[in-house]
Structure formats: structure tokens, C-alpha cells
Amino acid sequence: MKGWLQQHKPTARRSLSRHLIGVSVLALALVAGVGGWAATTELSSAIVAGGVVIVDDNVKKVQHLTGGIVGELLVKEGDRVEAGQVLIRLDGTTVRANLAIIESTLAQFYARRARLQAERMGAASFEIEEDLAEFIPGTAAAKLIEGEQRLFASRRSALSGMKGQLDSRKAQLADEVEGLTVQLNAIEEALKLIAEELTGVDSLFGQGLVPMQRVTTLKRQRAELEGGRGRHIAARAQARGKSSEIDLQILQLDEDRRSEISKELTDVEAKIAEYEERRTAATDQLRRLDITAPLSGRIYQLAIHTVNGVINPGETLMLVVPEAEDLTVEAKVATHDIDQIRVGQSVEIRFSAFNQRTTPEVEAEVVTVAPDLVTDERTGASYYPLRIRPKAESLAKLKGLSLYPGMPAEVFIKIADRTVISYLTKPLTDQMRHAFRED
């Protein structure tokens, strides 16, 4: 037996060597094949981040500035609405009544202003530039215009009457002046005759042909005529003075009238400005009786449910949430991955709220990258927020599934492809890089 073993021992060694060589070659081939595959095969890589569906323009609150009473409620929870669509119509009874009062008052002031402007210019008639029928019913407008025209004619007639009385008095004084002038001319003629007669009588008296009494009588008559002339001159001057006073009175009448009209006109202009502002405010309030949707979307958190309910100023009545085409995903990217993120990068989104077996991933792209990191106050974790917009054609693959703000999402941000060997060696190279930097 021992001899047999010794005889076959070299053969066994050769067989084992052959097996070892075969295994070694096979191992080298396997290592070379795997290494070649790892070095040449590229795998798609992506950064994975959590996200949430948000609204581009955010959810819009529907509020009313002044509040009021609900007249009509035109929507219900979950309704789809278009931008500008009427959601709630407030009761407008009080607003319309207030506007009617303001417009009626404004029409009166417009008519009064036209009359006063015509009176100030001394016109024989007036026209109103504004169409009063826009402010009050046609019959009321006609009555208002007719009333102002009657007042215009009455005031014009009253002024004309006062001026007529003064003109009559002035004409009387003119006649009086004329009569006094005639009397003065007669006195002057009489004085001239007495003077001639007195000259002749003085000559005869010097010759002793006439008595002294005759001379004295003529001188007395002359003195009386001169006194009368003085009184007539004074009376004529007084009459002329009164005539001048009448002229001043006529001027004063016009001046007082213009002053009164100017004051009234100033007051009316101020009132018109005030009521025009009030009309603008009332018209705006009337326009805001219709509470409309600020954008297209769906109604949520409807707070008003009954007609005749009271709305407080600034109260949130409902939310309008834009639908999927206006939605984006906000993702939180770790700080060590931000250097690989660029605007326009392709992204795949998986909405975890849906059935993962039947719901396809949605294609999207990065639209904004935050310039600075954000720290979550609750957890203390830091991250960079990204905005990712789903592509419309990819959203269509959801086949009727709706996205809503707040839904969770998982995003895969595609980055450069890497070989398998780079995945295997990266931890080692990172450790070596840190090791070589130690002091």
C-alpha cells in the first residue's frame, strides 16, 4: 500500500496543480470581466428628496372689505370656478338707496351751479352741461331743471325791478335838474333886466327925477332874485348828487349780487366735489356687491352657508385653490447635494398618496433653486428648497387623479451618469482624501 502511494504521488500533485491553475485563470477572468463591466457600465444616478405639493400663487382667500348681508350664495364646497366668476352677491338695498340719495343731491348741485354761472355772467338763460337723467329719473330731472329756471327768472326779475326803481328815481331827478336849470335861466334873465333898469333909475335918481323908494325897490328885487338863484343852484346840485348816488346804488346792486353768487358758487363747487367722491365710493361699493373668484380653481373651507347671513369686514369667506396645472412641488434638498442641482434639470416625481403599482411617475423639471439654505425651526435640519414644475403632458398620465396642495411627494433629481466602479470606490477615495489631510 505504501509503495502504491509513493508510486502515484507525483501524478496527484500534477493534477492538483492543473486544477489550481484552472481555478486561478477562471478567477482572473471573472475579476477582469466584472471589473471591465464595473468600469464601463454607467448607471443613472439621482438625488432623492422629499417634497410637498404647493400652489404657485398660493391659496387665495376670498374676503370683503366692508362686509354686508348675503343676498345670494352661488357656490358650494368643492365647486370648480373660473376667475371673475360671482361667488356671493350681497344684498344691495341700503347701498342702492344711499347711491340714489347721493346722485339726486348731486343733480341738484349741478343744476344750481349752471344757474349761478349764468347769473354771474348776466346771461338771459342757462343750460346744464351734465345729463341729469343719468342721476335721477327723467321726470324728476325735468322738474328740477324747471324749478331752477323759475328761480333764475325770478331772481333776474327781482334784480331788474330794483334797478328799474332806481332808474325811475334817477329820471325824476334828471327832470328836477332840468326844471331847476330853466328856473335859473329865468332868474338870470330877470337879474339882467333889473340891472339895466337899475342903471337907468340911478341916473334919474341922481337928477332928482325919481324917488329913492324906486331905487330901493329895484335893489330889493335884485337881492331876492339872487337869493332864489342861489337856492336853485343848491337844489340842482343836490339833485345831481342824488342821481350820482343812484348810479352807485345800481353798481352796488350788481356788486352785491356778484359777491353773493360767487359765495354760493364756491359752496356749490365744494359740495359737488364732496358728493362726486361720495358717488365714486358708493358706486365702488355697489360694484363690490358681487364677490368674485380671484383665480380659477376649486372652492374649499366655505364659511357662508345661508342667505341673509352677515359678513364681517375682512372675514375669510372661502378659499380658492388652483388646480393641478397651477401646482408645483417644493422639495427639500440636503446641503451636500445642492452643488449638483441646476435649473432645468429633469426630475421624476412619485406621489406617495396614490397607488404606486398603478400610478406612473410624473416627469418634471427644476424651475427655481433657493439662493440660501433654510433651517426647519421644528427639527433644526437645514436644507435648500427647490421648486419643481410637473410637465402638463406627463400630468395627463394620472388619468383623472387630482393633485391638491399639501400632498406628499418623492422626487428623483437626475444628475450625471456614473460607472459602477465609481460607486464602489467613492467611499474609499473619500476616506483616503480625508486621511491625507490629517495633521
Swiss-Prot record:
Superkingdom classification of source: Bacteria
InterPro entries named among the record's database cross-references: MFP (IPR050739), T1SS_HlyD (IPR010129)
GO-annotated cellular components: plasma membrane
Pfam families cross-referenced by the UniProt entry: HlyD_3
Places the protein is found: Cell inner membrane
UniProt KW Cell inner membrane keyword: yes
Chief location category: membrane
UniProt key word tRNA processing: no
Keyword annotations from UniProtKB, A to Z: Cell inner membrane, Cell membrane, Membrane, Plasmid, Transmembrane, Transmembrane helix, Transport
NCBIfam families (alphabetical): type_I_hlyD
Role this protein plays: Mediates secretion of glycanase ExsH.
Name used for this protein in its record: Type I secretion system membrane fusion protein PrsE
Protein species of origin: Rhizobium meliloti (strain 1021) (Ensifer meliloti)
Taxonomy of the source species: Bacteria, Pseudomonadati, Pseudomonadota, Alphaproteobacteria, Hyphomicrobiales
